Amino acid sequence: MRLLVSCVDSGSIKEVLCNIGTDTSVQSALQPFHVAPHLAEGLKAYVDRMWVISEDEAILARNSGVVELVKISKHLKENEALQVDPKGESKNEKSLSDDLPKFDISEFEITSSVSDLFDDAKLESLSSKSVKRTKLVDGFVTLCPIKKDSSNNTFVAATKSGLLHIIKKGEDKKLIKLASLGLKAPVEFLQLYDLEDTDTDKYIFAYGGEENLIKLVEIDSSFQSLKQIWEAKNVKNDRLDMRVPVWPMALRFLEPSPGKTEKGKLNYQFAAITRWSHLTKYSTQHGRKPFAQIDLLPNREPLSQMEVFDAKGENVVSSLGNFQSETFNELNVITTDYKKNVFKFDGNGRMLGKVGRDDITGSSTYIHVHDGKYLLQGGLDRYVRIFDIKTNKMLVKVYVGSRINFIVMLDDVEIEMPLSPSAKAAKGKQKRKVTELEEDADELWNKLEGKVAASKASKKSKI
């Protein structure tokens, strides 16, 4: 497996190469083959978001307000020319290469960047109104391609201050800022819609945040203007007739509602997680209020993230994380609180379990379902973990020495382990045994076929 991990403390991305079964917290367990930092720029410039464009290119967004285009090149890891075995005899290069696993490692080079993408002044006036105890600081909430396109040349970079930047990778491999548009701040998330081939002249996305109701926005292909096409309404007051606070934290679209639809009304469906531990379900055909609001946790513990998954381990999400289904009945969500819990719920709010409940010791700052099979998790305890989405079994645990902000799995290919001399001898012996059995079987069949042919010939001669 090959991972890229955003490390907050050093501002670097670390490349991690490991196999299933790796656990750095157990000395006798399998250890990672390679862990190396790249592009370190310090605590004030850690990587907020990453998007892998291709095998040899990625785009990074740092919390210093910079978006960078990065070239990735791979080369075979060089083994040391000489080692000494326990008996004191030196090993030559050939025997050493036979004893060590072979794999490629990556080198990263920044080829282009755009800067000054933040507006902290816009958040200063909102800090006094926020229930957060810390000052609001700008950061990236989204970095992704604006449409399903194999070329992936145009990207959306959205910030907490409500700035929406359109950035293009030119033919000369340089980043160009095409436009910057404004949204209502503060913004906790911005989610693009990618579940159907919409009109190429417009793109749809949803956003929201603290006291910022969910809004659907349409942007034209020229990227010069945007138009709000729908806004949610708050639910009715609670049983004490108190206003319910608004704070959507994350959102995922579903496919359009099937069957009969009312003309003149938008047809979008989506589910959202709120800060106050609600799962809300919306259909624009139904109205502006959620048609269902489910309490996930009894004491309204704050929740922060949202991923959707299939209980059978199948890939049910689009490239941007939206749920490829028309019905909420099949919806399953993973979310995290600010303690140490990673929860799994079905679409009706029934808890399906906790992931890593006996192992995770700090708040999870990042979760992601990869390819429907793996849950990537990292947080304050400085461990990268990979879980099996069906069984919740921990497959990988690697210490990276820093708080974790983002994880990308580049591939899940296992690195082939070289065999020891005794294992090689046993494997060769087994192979020879199989070959001998196959030869004996062939010889036996040949004898039987010869006898059958001779029997037929004798019968013909008698006739």
UniProtKB/Swiss-Prot annotation:
InterPro entries referenced in this protein's UniProt entry, alphabetically: WD40_repeat_dom_sf (IPR036322), WDR74/Nsa1 (IPR037379)
**Superkingdom of the organism of origin:** Eukaryota
Q: Which UniProt keywords apply?
A: Nucleus, Ribosome biogenesis, rRNA processing
Described by its record, this protein's role is as follows: Involved in the biogenesis of the 60S ribosomal subunit.
Q: Which PANTHER family does this one have?
A: NOP SEVEN ASSOCIATED PROTEIN 1, WD REPEAT-CONTAINING PROTEIN 74
The miscellaneous comment for this protein is:
Present with 2740 molecules/cell in log phase SD medium.
Q: What is this protein called?
A: Ribosome biogenesis protein NSA1
